[in-house]
């Protein structure tokens, strides 16, 4: 291959060195290496370098550069191993380089999927309104092993899930339209399901709120009932009652309450 004729520190980056090699055919080859690679291979002026050694040096320097890229990526927040792998692939790193970099990152505790999973769950339950199923899906997408997902989700207790689900319920309640209780329960149940809460949490929230809904249920029935009344008042009495009951029942109101409403209309001579 040749002999090292000069080693000089780079002006703009004092942690990298330019190495000049006088090749056997008289040509000069100049390449750069990290200071750690320089020390690792004990490079010095006058040293003979063969092709195999040169390739080892180039590979080691590529590992070092990729390692620095990974550290930069990790400087913003904790990452899963899969996130690091995906990032380095986008940067053009080979599989073997990435494997060596990951090994070094693990050794230095810069990546740890178990710690990442626990930190992720803590952050999500404290700063978002996500249920455990959504968090699980996100961790799976980030490449975290099932073992760490199971362990980390265990810190999201049932009571904490209920409290988070209740806060979502309270926000949604402010925007509730004139709906039957059955429709409302279905709607809020779907909302909590999409947010990733298990059925037992949803049931607990809906059960704890049912007592305060009777008055709202009647208000919703009156609202929908008067709309239906205006639509069907042209019909004779038997047909009118049939259409009213069908319309309000489809809206989710119980038959007993519908009949009470119709009696109230009759008593008030609304027809």
UniProtKB/Swiss-Prot annotation:
<comment type="similarity">
    <text>Belongs to the RecX family.</text>
</comment>
<comment type="function">
    <text>Modulates RecA activity.</text>
</comment>
<dbReference type="InterPro" id="IPR003783">
    <property type="entry name" value="Regulatory_RecX"/>
</dbReference>
<protein>
    <recommendedName>
        <fullName>Regulatory protein RecX</fullName>
    </recommendedName>
</protein>
<dbReference type="Pfam" id="PF02631">
    <property type="entry name" value="RecX_HTH2"/>
</dbReference>
<dbReference type="InterPro" id="IPR053925">
    <property type="entry name" value="RecX_HTH_3rd"/>
</dbReference>
<dbReference type="GO" id="GO:0006282">
    <property type="term" value="P:regulation of DNA repair"/>
</dbReference>
<keyword id="KW-0963">Cytoplasm</keyword>
<dbReference type="Pfam" id="PF21981">
    <property type="entry name" value="RecX_HTH3"/>
</dbReference>
<dbReference type="InterPro" id="IPR053926">
    <property type="entry name" value="RecX_HTH_1st"/>
</dbReference>
<dbReference type="GO" id="GO:0005737">
    <property type="term" value="C:cytoplasm"/>
</dbReference>
<dbReference type="Pfam" id="PF21982">
    <property type="entry name" value="RecX_HTH1"/>
</dbReference>
<dbReference type="InterPro" id="IPR053924">
    <property type="entry name" value="RecX_HTH_2nd"/>
</dbReference>
<dbReference type="InterPro" id="IPR036388">
    <property type="entry name" value="WH-like_DNA-bd_sf"/>
</dbReference>
């Amino acid at each position: 291959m040749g002999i090292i004729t000069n080693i000089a520190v780079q002006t703009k980056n004092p942690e990298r060195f330019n190495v000049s090699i006088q090749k056997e055919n008289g040509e000069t080859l100049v390449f750069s290496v990290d200071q750690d690679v320089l020390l690792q291979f004990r490079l010095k002026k006058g040293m003979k370098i063969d092709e195999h050694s040169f390739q080892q040096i180039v590979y080691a320097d590529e590992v070092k550069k990729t390692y620095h890229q990974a550290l930069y990526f990790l400087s913003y927040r904790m990452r899963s191993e899969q996130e690091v792998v995906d990032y380095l692939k986008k940067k053009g790193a080979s599989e073997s380089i990435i494997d060596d970099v990951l090994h070094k990152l693990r050794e230095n505790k810069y990546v740890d999927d178990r710690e990442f999973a626990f930190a992720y769950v803590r952050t999500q339950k404290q700063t978002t309104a996500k249920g455990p199923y959504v968090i699980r899906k996100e961790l799976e997408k980030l490449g975290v092993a099932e073992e760490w997902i199971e362990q980390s989700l265990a810190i999201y207790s049932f009571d904490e899930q209920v409290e988070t689900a209740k806060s979502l319920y309270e926000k949604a309640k402010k925007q509730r339209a004139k709906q039957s209780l059955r429709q409302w329960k279905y709607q809020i149940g779907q909302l909590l399901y999409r947010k990733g809460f298990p059925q037992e949490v949803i049931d607990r929230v809906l059960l704890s709120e049912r007592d305060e809904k009777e008055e709202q249920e009647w208000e919703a029935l009156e609202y929908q009932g008067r709309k239906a009344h205006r639509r069907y008042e042209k019909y004779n009495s038997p047909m009118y009652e049939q259409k009213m009951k069908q319309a309000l029942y489809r809206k989710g109101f119980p038959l007993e309450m519908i009949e009470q409403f119709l009696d109230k209309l009759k008593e008030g001579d609304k027809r």
